[in-house]
Swiss-Prot record:
One of its GO terms (molecular function) is transcription corepressor activity. It comes from Dictyostelium discoideum (Social amoeba). InterPro entries: Prefoldin, Prefoldin_subunit_alpha, UXT. Belongs to the UXT family. Coiled coil: none annotated. GO terms for biological process: negative regulation of transcription by RNA polymerase II. GO terms for cellular component: chromatin; mediator complex. This is Protein UXT homolog. NCBIfam families: prefoldin subunit alpha. PANTHER family: MEDIATOR OF RNA POLYMERASE II TRANSCRIPTION SUBUNIT 10, PROTEIN UXT.
Amino acid sequence: MVSHSHSHTHQNQKDIEKEKLLKERLDSIKYYETFINETLNVDLNKSIEDREKVLENLENYLELKSNIELLIENKMDSMKTMINLGSECYVKARVQDTSYIYVDIGLGIHVKYTLEEAIKFINEKETFLNKTVENQTKKINQIKTKIDLIQNGLKELKHLE
């Protein structure tokens, strides 16, 4: 009789241990799912947005560069253009002197350059922006790798019995 109740207590002890392990595992699963959703995915989306802005910036500089190269090639000392007044509302304009150009170098600061200086500046800016995109892509891939690793870990945690 005595030995029977002893094994019964032993079984309860095992059940309590099992219960405890299960609870810890569920807590871990919840913790890592929250970490993925509230931290990693947020970082990932922000990093992707940041990279998009840099790519857009790069595109604008490259467009400007090709326009400047056209001015130089065609030896245009004056030109007609359309100026965007905002909200896609344009007005015709005539540029009397194309030997100088004002380039937005960031933070709303415009610098007066000769066309050749502007090309030189844009080439440097292009190198910098390409490097930035490269770094942001690395960061995005690192975050994606972290998410994958944790998701694989979660899969294993969920399949443990």
